[in-house]
Amino acid sequence: MEAKKFKVIIVEDVKLELKGTEEIFRHEIPDAEVIGTAMTEQEFWSLMEAGVPDLVLLDLGLGGSTTIGVDICRNIFKRY
């Protein structure tokens, strides 16, 4: 019986880093299922509405800000 995969959302605003991280998860971590990627906060919240992951890999400096990533973390804990 195959083990259930854990669901991952990757949030990164640098496209090369986003795609590289996604490829690592898809090819090197067989227990992970990337259920979505986002380059903006708005894209991230849309993904969360579609389904809550087990893991969010989040760029804390999203959009060049030093607070957006931290605010997203706080809101995840408040909502979920």
Model-derived features: positions:
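Non-catalytic signal-transmission and effector/linker regions of two-component phosphorelay proteins
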Residues: 1-9
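Acidic phosphotransfer microenvironment of two-component signaling modules
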Residues: 15, 39-43, 74
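Amphipathic alpha1 helix at the N-terminus of the CheY-like receiver
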Residues: 16-27
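Acidic, metal-coordinating helix/loop segments flanking the phosphotransfer/catalytic sites
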Residues: 22, 35-55, 63
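Hydrophobic alpha-helical motif in two-component signaling modules
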Residues: 48, 57, 70-73
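Short amphipathic alpha-helix used as the core "switch/output" element in two-component signaling
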Residues: 66-80
